[in-house]
From Swiss-Prot:
Disulfide bonds: none annotated. InterPro entries: UPF0145_dom_sf, UPF0145_YbjQ-like. It comes from the Archaea. It comes from Halorubrum lacusprofundi (strain ATCC 49239 / DSM 5036 / JCM 8891 / ACAM 34). This is UPF0145 protein Hlac_1015. Belongs to the UPF0145 family. The lineage of its organism: Archaea, Methanobacteriati, Methanobacteriota, Stenosarchaea group, Halobacteria.
């Protein structure tokens, strides 16, 4: 599956547009992680626990988007975008979306 955040993929021609595809996941924060990350936040620096959480969530959302594209018979997704939003006080949603296409 070829992915691109632009309207095209170099060296490929879009021969059919199959429609919007998306994948999402909602992740809740971990109380234990919140405590350690809160202490680290006082000292400054990267909050690696949250970085890992968001990276894993983005990967899962992207994988789900790809599964939806494959179900349509696509071999590419163009205009790929990611969004995040807060869910309640302790959760975050990651949404990956794009346009499923057939390429030549």
């Amino acid at each position: 599956m070829e992915l691109s955040n632009t309207e095209s993929i170099a060296g490929k021609e879009v021969v059919e547009t199959l429609g919007l595809v998306r994948g999402n996941t909602v992740r809740a924060r971990n109380v234990g992680r919140d405590i350690t990350q809160g202490l680290r936040n006082l000292a400054g620096g990267e909050l690696k626990g949250y970085t890992e959480l968001m990276t894993d969530a983005r990967d899962q959302a992207q994988d789900r988007m790809i599964e939806e594209a494959e179900a349509l018979g696509a071999d590419g997704v163009i205009n790929v975008r990611f969004t995040t939003s807060s869910i309640a006080d302790s959760g975050a949603e990651i949404l990956a979306y794009g346009t499923a296409v057939r390429l030549r």
